[in-house]
Amino acid sequence: MLRLGSHVSMSGKKMLLGASEEAASYGSNTFMIYTGAPQNTRRKPIEELNIEAGLEHMKAHDMADIVVHAPYIINIGNSVKPETFELGVNFLQSEIERTRALGAKQIVLHPGAHVGEGADKGIKQIIQGLNEALIHDQDVQIALETMAGKGSECGRTFEEIAQIIDGVTHNELLSVTFDTCHTHDAGYDIVNDFDGVLNEFDKIIGVDRLKVLHINDSKNECGAHKDRHANIGFGHIGFDALHYIVHHPQLADVPKILETPYVGEDKASKKAPYKWEIAMLRNGEFDPDLLNKIQNS
């Protein structure tokens, strides 16, 4: 079954219930959340996440295979500042616990940045961090995200992701998030040869590890190493390529999550595009006037 949704907010008193309600309003049947603000460590206790009511709403609205995203502040690739590395390991462990409590099986993680020390050193540090953070009996997988190669990001090639996986002792607890914008920006031609790219992924990593898809268009050309998301069909990847990926038979059971930008001139008037983009990806017809329609809705 096609599981298609977006990033939604989990906040206020409603927490998980609010996230599921927002997802349902977009016509989603899955969604992705952060368990708190992605840029800091402040977190509500698990008891305040309103999990029971959230799970009930999800069941009633056929929501499944939800995904958690780890916060950006985790950088287990940092070999320069031990305190940053330690914070990353400890915080990742607590986020895994929260993911499990929410009933999710996948927590998406940006592998890490080597902060100028070189990819080999960064990857070695990431492996060490994952070996420390992973608890053998956990049923949550860390879904390492394919990165665009901006700055000193590790995980910009399938080989780098494979290197991390191969170095981790309990790597059955690792999976991969394939981000269309990042992979395109990293230099993979998903527009003209997605099957070839998927084949390469399968040879190097194994397609059975691909557990989450981030569906985003890109504001930049292939190989730009920028990572700037565009609305579906309004970037350099284009609607046809993204529709092909969303409906790809080999990826039928993988949840597909949109992280496209809100539409509008200023912060106050910006609107979530997900209801429209999800409908468009489901029905297979691109609407070139979509952004105007969203703004005027």
From Swiss-Prot:
Binds 3 Zn(2+) ions. One of its GO terms (molecular function) is deoxyribonuclease IV (phage-T4-induced) activity. Zn(2+) 3 binds at H182, D227, H229. It comes from the Bacteria. Pfam families: AP_endonuc_2 (PF01261). Zn(2+) 2 binds at E145, D179, H214, E259. Its cofactor is Zn(2+). It catalyses: Endonucleolytic cleavage to 5'-phosphooligonucleotide end-products. Zn(2+) 1 binds at H69, H110, E145. GO terms for biological process: base-excision repair. Keywords: DNA damage, DNA repair, Endonuclease, Hydrolase, Metal-binding, Nuclease, Zinc. Its EC number is 3.1.21.2. PANTHER family: APURINIC-APYRIMIDINIC ENDONUCLEASE, ENDONUCLEASE IV ENDODEOXYRIBONUCLEASE IV. Endonuclease IV plays a role in DNA repair. It cleaves phosphodiester bonds at apurinic or apyrimidinic (AP) sites, generating a 3'-hydroxyl group and a 5'-terminal sugar phosphate. Belongs to the AP endonuclease 2 family. This is Probable endonuclease 4. It comes from Listeria monocytogenes serotype 4b (strain CLIP80459).
